[in-house]
UniProtKB/Swiss-Prot annotation:
Pfam families: Acetyltransf_16. Residues 219-261, 282-328 are annotated as: Disordered. Residues 5-185 form the N-acetyltransferase domain. The keyword Transferase applies. GO terms for cellular component: microtubule. This is Alpha-tubulin N-acetyltransferase 2. Specifically acetylates 'Lys-40' in alpha-tubulin on the lumenal side of microtubules. Promotes microtubule destabilization and accelerates microtubule dynamics; this activity may be independent of acetylation activity. Acetylates alpha-tubulin with a slow enzymatic rate, due to a catalytic site that is not optimized for acetyl transfer. Enters the microtubule through each end and diffuses quickly throughout the lumen of microtubules. Residues 312-328 have a biased composition (Polar residues).
Amino acid sequence: MSSTSQVALLPKLSLPDGVTVWDGTALEYERRCNNIDEHAVHLMQTINILGIRSKEAQCLNTVLTSVARLRENRQARVYLLCQDGYGVGILKMGVKKLFVTHPSYSSLVEIDPLCVLDFFVDTSFQRKGFGKTLFDAMLLNEGLNPGEVAIDRPSVKFLAFLRKYYGLVEYTPQSNNFVVFHRYFDKWQPQRGKGHRGGNAVPTRSIVRPQNCLRVYPEYQSTTGPNDNFEEDATHRTPPPPLPPPLVPQGSVNSPGPGKKTAYELQYEEYLREQAYRRRQGGDPRLQPVPNPVSSSEIAAASCGARRRMSPTRSGVQYNIISGTPEH
């Protein structure tokens, strides 16, 4: 099929030449707020058509890249390469949690790298440098080196591409069919039995240029090819995920949690109530024997009993290891 007939199946886009990044949130925004002259409709048609062509070219059983899949997986994103107003290539990326064999000590480790899930350049535009332009734009936007990216079931042609342009050769075959090159583990450090993305934990820095009708906002970024010369107008940083709330051990005395009182506070309130009751009875509280308030740590040490005898150093209070009572 000729180049003209293939391109005719794709709608005309109001995007400049270069690479733009799209995820489910960005596409939904375009559909609702920026659908001038059916721009969003043509954009989604282009992604779906290139996803189908990628499936047919790789002889896959299912389509890997589509607007519906991007809406289902909000972490996935597609880099779209345009030339003369038409989409000519797609590169789908997403973070995956993988168990892979470490090349040094041959044991399974857990990693969560950014993965190439689909990579396709239209057959009419192959062997013209578009594939490298698309891949380089992704590396620039994600702030990664080529070896820090994992690939899902790469073809022989894709492996030859990585070897030719990036020198990626050595990798250990994995049971999940993901290719993780040995270079990935140069910066990888295990953390309590788990791995982390080599280099950066989240996509960090992208060079953004406002492009015609393309609106740039925090949900997505746009980049251009590596050979374009342009000024850096803005820098977007993807916010890291929020930190989990601090864990408070159950039964903790010193960290009761929000809205709860310590044992010392409860005892002191009981002491005040007892004083008020004696005043109402007409007695002089100064003549009544009232126990002095003790610290919460002493209360905990006295109430733990046998458990405290097993680990005397866990408490900061000196107590008898036999009886478990505080020493005064």
